[in-house]
């Protein structure tokens, strides 16, 4: 088991000191999330000021971006961090996608599954494993010229985690992602009775085993000077 934490920042310039402090304290990983600041830029700063802390987004909003954009971000963050990056994606909720990001909300679980598969298809092209020919219901990526191909990543590919709460989005993580990020509003009962069966359903759909999926369980913690 690893112990991670999120690092909410009021000022993005704090990333250089806060993530270094997390590493010094002994955390295994420090994660950003999409709130007041861009979750990727703060981690790029953190990567330059840490040595072994695992870094990731938990979560970056997938539906506010497209698979090619996310593929570039994940690939570059893996290089900048020296192989320590986790691309953590989530859907947000319909009002935020439509009214805050002016995006499209439809078939969220199916769309999330397709985003992950599209990113992996793009990475496979860059790694020289297959030509780019991804044609899905929501996204199409069928052209890649040498000028836009960064080539194989010297640190390998970053894992893709997706967040979920309901059964369909949770099953989507089991089907396509490398890891699942449980919503902070969870309990032991909800994980055992709802999340794990949904993950297993998704794993079975893609012919994978439970050992193929990492689970990151978020927990809300309140501390004070006296406790």
Q: Model-predicted segments: where are they?
A:
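Active-site-adjacent structural elements that line small-molecule/cofactor binding pockets in enzymes
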Residues: 1-227
